[in-house]
């Protein structure tokens, strides 16, 4: 293989010219979580249980539509895609039965992404294990392999599933994530990571269920990787690497007492069973469970509720035909009985708990366990096998290691796992905003500080006022960056998921067009990213079919930056071109490179007209009462360094004043094309007739490169070596209001008359 298009150099990404690359990306796409044929979003029940006979061909979008979506994302300044796929998409029909049609289709989608110059890394996505357990990810047959009967999940509350909820429209917001602490997900993750230790009787096809599940998952991903390798034009040219399994979870491993809620369990919502209560209701017993709601300071108990399955169980009956998928279950593993009862955790004849600390230590060795021990042993054992399988196909693959969310990362620094071609993949969400679906300008909480024991009491973690909240988000992300260097070693860090809900305040913005709350929340998250010194991010999420009624069409989530029911900010195609001869060649802003680059200007009047006639999807589904808005685009369509000739020291965008600033340590490379630092400069904020640029040294120009017919605005800066800075002033606007005030234009005109270099 030739020169790597993107390589890891310590904690930095570099291009073939040795310049620093910042990954500014997006997750593509939400539809990848559920099948295309039949089309079964999480609010549809028809055909839900026939999960073997599905197809993901056409996910996340058709080949015909791929150009529309990739060009849109490129126009918005994204250069990176976290490409979402599921294990189910590859191996839904049964163990070892791969969907080659889906793989071939995906390779064609990746070829189209290549035409737009994206860096793509592949995300084997899961949420709470599987679609049939209320999320996405693993094929349905994995549940049957573990002895579960998905049709019994509803009555037992072994998993809360929107598809089987009585009224899917009333499915409680964000309750899907509580499935991580319900029977099915707890069991599946325990078996996947620790079945040999905790379920030695679970033998299938002569091996433990841990090896069976992990073996099939890794083999499926390796098969996919091999097909990409054989394609010959995907590796390195568009796909730069693979992420490990999305949001791994310990299940029950390390839980000290299954008769109580673990003190470290942060989320409680709706009914909140202990692990033992989940085992009882999963076996048909009635239990009175505490009920919880989520408020401004976190979860609080609201009462108690009787969960009565009336004898129905979450386990397959003893007479189930276990030949369906061709495996042979060991006679010592009985169907029709809770797997944990079979391992002596509790007695089904008396319903008594026998070993409340069964998962607190390794049953085979007696070694004490906690979440850190899980991460450093069980998680890492799987990660190594996954990494090595993919590297056996493509040795140069960058592996994005994603440890358990919000937990201390594995201690790899200076060990054999301190892999120079590894990237730390981190997820972060502002939990209060996500769960309450409200941007609270009054207070927020330093969640990471609480989790890491920074405060004597959580009361000290409360941050008052929007400035303090923004700084708190930034400081949490900066802490995670520094923590990564301490534990993982010197590697790049990418926030591969971060985002906000758009259906805030009972969908107020959809009724009024006022996205000011979303703008503030999204801007605060980007402010945090920019201040964290991370190497980039992939925002969650882009969903092609997002709409005001069902959001992302998955569990009531509504995090997509795009919706068919909202407007898009105007693209360069809507802006009026200017005759190049009108430019003054003597102007300091004029350079030789501009003479060879197609450029255009837009005035305030043209901009306002363009904003009133935006480009939107041809498919509109919103109700007639909805008022179209710009979906907080002014907060996420923002300037960013893309290529830096040297080392980034600091950068950020002040949305309120519309000022981008950047400080760097430059390297001397001359004045060639490969020597420039490049900044994505969205023309929405920085129309070239009203943009003021100030640099400490060097020359700069604004041009409009074209990638596969997509034009975007870029600032290129040739600076000397050493410590230098740039400041770019654009057009100030009120949050949610795309128009330009006379006062703001007057300010810019004064800047123009002050001798600044103006584009």
Curated annotation (Swiss-Prot):
Keyword Transferase: no
One of the GO BP terms on file: ergosteryl 3-beta-D-glucoside catabolic process
Classification via InterPro entries: GH5_C, Glyco_hydro_5, Glyco_hydro_5_CS, Glyco_hydro_b, Glycoside_hydrolase_SF, Glycosphingolipid_Hydrolases
Keyword Hydrolase (UniProt): yes
EC number(s) stated in the UniProt entry for this protein: 3.2.1.45
Polar residues biased stretches: 584-599
Function: Specifically hydrolyzes the glucosidic linkage in glucosylceramide. May prevent accumulation of aberrent glucosylceramide containing immature ceramide.
Protein name: Glucosylceramidase
Gene: egc1
